[in-house]
């Protein structure tokens, strides 16, 4: 980390510039001066080598090299700096995986079986055109008793059959091996009966079709290979080491005269070509003992087709052997043999795996050792991996031979790193869930990267599963991320999580610089287990990292050297919720109800167990903050809602408030044990930040839930996060402290003794949500809030809670250009509607950044980037306007970010895959930068497209002018709808049937009658015919009046009024 972290250019970093001879010259200069140089002498020495730095660059370089914080540079310090720089430039040094290879839980697919499973295989789907689909097919399990079961892809039963000897119907079989033949729709079984039984599996039928009998010895291992443009081959090995290959030609038909549908063919007939559909190639006795495994391999070198076979030494044979015999052989398929390689292993080989890309051959046997072979030098294994305590029965390779998985007889799996030749993981859960004393079989599914292990039950577990990049970008940690910090000295990001990992990131190129695993540990029930990291901070020079854990332990880390310098304990099993490094003091607090002070360095610590400050909280301390102005002040808040201001210089409290009633001041207790001055504890149980069930936050449909005023007053509130504004002076008329309540409100305080509560505003727009973390920039212009539902909001606070004479005019058009959220919407979203009635602050941005709780926010002023961490195990990068850059630790890389400027306008921004489908239109608008490419409108003339800005502009001017809708040249004629299909409702009023209430003494009839307006009749001098038409209209009006009904049932008030 040392070299890449300096502010100098890459060509001026020491480890990249100096040569080996120049390092020797530096060593001679240090040796001549007692192995140490002053900082000025070191600068002159580097200048002689051609390395020149400015004052700021050299000051940063000295802080990185000089870990002793003195005026001298030791040779050991410079050498450590160079070594760390070389390690950081190694591309393989930071590829350490956070998750172990087998990290998930075991998934039980089959419960306890009647017959123990000895073989698991997968039969893919083969279509009529010869194409193969590995995503469709059947799982097949076999028992020693010959019970064969077919299962669907999700392990639902499909077919159950039994294999019995073809000639001895009443005798029991003992199955040795099975193999499916997918292209022939057949299944091959071999047992102790010295015969090959081939069953036809079509349409849920399991029928015996072919029996190859009279084999010299029982077949113990089989392998099958098929393809569209090649014949199907079955490779077999027997108890004496003979290897034979059967080639199937289904296009060759044979007519049989017998009545039986089963064809019986002897091995000699197949060898002599008497049965045309099957040919046999006999390779002879290539191995001395029982063949345990055979496998076809791809072309190696100039040889097109090969196979590998291995044999285990028979312990029952007591014959003396003068010279070692081969236990594994690589042989060509063609005869005479073009290539034959023999490997001699003591006690034989039971299993092997081969990787054609790098020609890596791995073997395991009863001697419990894994051997890695170079096939071009078979005399001696290149590497021997020792670690198993029983015979190895199964192994496979992953990621082009980078990892080896091996399973032994005790059902313990070990994962090995081939490159570094070290053990990565020992997984022993199979030994606890499977019955003891019964061998287990295994099958590795390359497509799903899953391992199937079966005995009396069947379990499936994932082995380094691949990330589905269409649904997620991956993860940064293996458990929720709790702390996110930015180191200005090294210009790196540091994240800590509940997995007890400390990871240093180069966020510009998405690279892990340092990984510290098991940073905090404890021994429980005799087992060393990691402890969750809950708080962290840097020292003033940002050279040291202080972390606090859930068990109450504190550790000081050297970021440059990646070592733990000191370990402190505030209290046993006491979660640390806040740590601060002030000058030479360390302040820690948590669930111990008080602040504990330590000396930063052990030689200066007069109180090894810490100096406890006066107790002012009646419950656990949830959050704390330290002001950046003078005089130094620290604010702490407990679960009961007690907010206490402390003077850092003296450690004395000077103000105490209640978050539920912010305008009332609580008395300060100056004696221990004054329970009458303490606030009563909350009755609701306390939970950690990430322990809220997801179902409790999922079903949120309302904008806001309003509680009754009485319950609102009785409810005790606690502050979830505190934030000081460092640029604001300590004055009574200025809001300098923000605190987020658990009901979604944000309170504003002044930490001046004459200040107090200044106001509050609503910071959420979803019911039940709350603000978990707060952050701001150096100039205190913006306030960033992160909520429990994953939303990130940006507020403009520069002009809020300050005196009127200091307020100024805000350039809102410039902010609208910077934040796409401020663009007009046809229908305002919930975020805008919730903040519409608030006078201050101004909501600039709101979008969903995570699917889970946001636990930390950090803003980088130089580059304008906002980093967020969440309980969904991710750390994400955003621009100030809300554009998504990437996820730290993701396999999806992004363009390298500039060092000191924001990303350019033409930067390739993306949308998180997990947020593409289920987000609001407001979040989607922010993620797209105000451009909606999926919703485009055709223009009238040119046939072009109109963007969202054009649509919004048209919607804004809709009140001024509404254009006429163009039709086919003439207005539509009545009726517009086809009345024969859809009958229009009657235009007369629909009157309900009224049921009179007989409890009243009188009925208010006329009060509830609907009266139609009566139009006066006009008397004119018309003809008799015209007068007759008027009288007809009058009669129709009278008929409608007679059909009148009551409108509504009478009420009590109406009845009293009538009386």
UniProtKB/Swiss-Prot annotation:
SUPFAM superfamilies, per database record: EF-hand, WD40 repeat-like
Keyword terms: Repeat, WD repeat
UniProt KW Amino-acid biosynthesis keyword: no
PROSITE patterns attached to this UniProt entry: WD_REPEATS_1, WD_REPEATS_2, WD_REPEATS_REGION
Disulphides: none
WD repeat extents: 121-161, 170-209, 214-256, 344-383, 387-426, 476-515, 528-567, 616-658, 714-759, 766-805, 849-888
Classification via PANTHER family: EF-HAND CALCIUM BINDING DOMAIN 8, WD40 REPEAT DOMAIN 95
Protein's name according to its UniProt entry: WD repeat-containing protein on Y chromosome
Gene: WDY
